Amino acid sequence: IMAEEKRKRILSGIQPTGTPTLGNYIGAVRNWALLQSDYDCLYMVADLHSLTVRQVPADLRRRTRELAALLLAVGIDPKEHVLFVQSHVPAHTELAWVLACNTQFGELSRMTQFKDKSAKHPDNVNGGLFTYPVLMAADILIYNADLVPVGQDQTQHLEIARDIAGRFNGIYGDTFTLPEGYVPAAGAKIMSLAEPTKKMSKSDTNINSFILMTDDKDAIVRKFKRAVTDSDGVVRFDRETKPGVSNLMCIYSTFTGKSNDEIAAEFEGKGYGDFKLAVAEVTADALAPVQAEYARILADRAYVDEVLKNGAERASRLANRTVSKVYRKVGLLQLDK
């Protein structure tokens, strides 16, 4: 009998920069839980990446623990898979240096996210922001991940990770797996409720533009009521001419499993008020059990820390093996342990 085919490995990370939004939930975290049955998963709280923006130390610590608790609450299984904090696995930064020495200045200069962010915050264009894609490449390559769930804004970073891996393999012999992007089938991108042509973001100054995973039902209803739609009063999917309504349909579809045609039929002849309330109801109902579980897990600080300690140990075993191999290949002297 043939051995069971080796499961592919997935690595994904999320920064602990505030509570995840409904967009993060639908686009990423919810899928993380669903991927567990088919893949070996490593899920990372990317705290080192957060340092490209100056953080309040106590807040960063608290949010790191909160994010870990939230990931456990959505159903990440820390026994079957690996949940860890990036800074707890020092090998990431060790590999990042070697990779940086195999990355061209020009390649990093061309990264659109670097150009966008440095234009937006010209007062803080730090070296970390510039070499961010190298650390991200290290995060992925250190585990020889086969697949990386990425949003549109990160595809370029995945490309450079593949380029760096391919170049390193070419010079030093086969070392790294070339990772591929994994784009989930449904609802990958949830837009702002206030400006439905741009992505929902927790850094938005208008608090009505996003829904946080921890928002209570009243807040959810209030924010959906204020969501921007259009004046034609028909629930119909069309991203170009009806971005607001289409975004709400996307959210409704995610939680009900209904197709756009079914949703259009359900609300035929009804106003947007009814539709918005229905979207708010299904969203609040979907988030309620996650919120209850989150509160329960967060209250058990020792458990969260135990999970993270265990995750760091398991991640480090894989990561250290890669770094050791890379150090040997590039000629760094290693002494017998």
What are these regions (language model features)?
Residues 14-16, 47-49, 146-147, 204, ...:
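Short, histidine-centered active-site or binding-site loop motifs used for metal coordination
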Residues 22-24, 162-337:
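Conserved nucleotide- and phosphate/pyrophosphate-binding catalytic cores
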Residues 103-109, 142-149, 253-263:
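Short helix-capping/linker segments at secondary-structure and domain boundaries
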Residues 3-11, 16-138, 282-285, 295:
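N-terminal Rossmann-like or analogous alpha/beta NTP/dinucleotide-binding catalytic cores
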